[in-house]
A protein has these predicted regions:
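Structural signal for well-ordered, non-membrane alpha-helices
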Residues: 16-19, 38-45
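Arg/Lys-rich, positively charged N-terminal/basic patches that mediate binding to nucleic acids
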Residues: 1-34
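Generic structural signal for secondary-structure transition and capping sites
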Residues: 27, 42, 46-49, 89
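Solvent-exposed interaction patches of small proteins and small membrane subunits
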Residues: 30-32, 52-55, 89-95
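Enriched for short, Lys/Arg-rich terminal
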Residues: 69, 73-97
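Basic/aromatic recognition patch in beta-strand/loop cores that engages polyanionic ligands
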Residues: 39, 46-78
């Protein structure tokens, strides 16, 4: 059985900012980005240990077609999505929670 995905408030903020940015760039691009994020959540949920570590217990998964990674931590009963990070930003932000 797959663990549930929980999304931190910071990750939700990251997601909304990215969707808003892409919607300004091109109509419908924000929806495409959100679809790719949801696909990546599904991959994380199915195989949480398949991704590489960024720091201690934090793993990351690359989002297809966009310059983003999702950082997460596999906990006992759930998978916590920590950040949805634009890879063009400061690398130190990856470790913020």
């Amino acid at each position: 059985m797959h663990k549930i995905i929980s999304i931190t408030p910071r990750a939700l903020e990251d997601l909304q900012q990215a969707i808003d940015h892409y919607n300004v760039q091109l109509q419908g691009l924000g929806i495409r980005f959100e679809d790719n994020i949801n696909d990546t959540f599904g991959k994380i949920q199915k195989m949480p240990k398949a991704a590489s570590f960024t720091h201690d217990t934090v793993r990351y998964k690359v989002v297809q077609d966009f310059p983003f990674i999702i950082t997460y931590e596999e906990l006992e009963t759930r998978i916590a999505i920590l950040r949805i990070f634009n890879t063009h930003q400061d690398d130190e932000k990856i470790f913020e929670r």
